[in-house]
Swiss-Prot record:
PANTHER family noted in UniProt: 30S RIBOSOMAL PROTEIN S14 (PTHR19836), SMALL RIBOSOMAL SUBUNIT PROTEIN US14M (PTHR19836:SF19)
Key words, A-Z: Ribonucleoprotein, Ribosomal protein, RNA-binding, rRNA-binding
Name of one Pfam family that matches: Ribosomal_S14
GO cellular-component term (any): cytoplasm
Recorded name of the encoding gene: rpsN
SUPFAM superfamilies, A to Z: Glucocorticoid receptor-like (DNA-binding domain)
Protein's name in the database: Small ribosomal subunit protein uS14
Biological process according to GO: translation
Function statement: Binds 16S rRNA, required for the assembly of 30S particles and may also be responsible for determining the conformation of the 16S rRNA at the A site.
GO MF annotation list: rRNA binding; structural constituent of ribosome
Amino acid sequence: MAKTSQVNRNKRREKMAARDAAKRAALKAIVNDRSLPVEDRFDATLKLAQLPRNGAKTRVRLRCELTGRARGNYRKFKLCRVALRDLASAGQIPGMVKSSW
């Protein structure tokens, strides 16, 4: 089980990233638009730099929903490999069966 402070920090970052996503996308579109004057693009760069860093999507870490483990996660299930194996062998994940050939 991961530290609750790490899990809570990541959840706070997820909320901030969702809240700031539209604003960041608009500013990035202005910065990358070559048809606009340099001054406008530079102002957009400064505004983008003023936004909190924790609001960036890249700061969010994919963690297991059950254990909070940060490594060895499957995106499709939002579970770490350990929790996925336990749930799958217990028959808790519909459609997932142990492979044999």
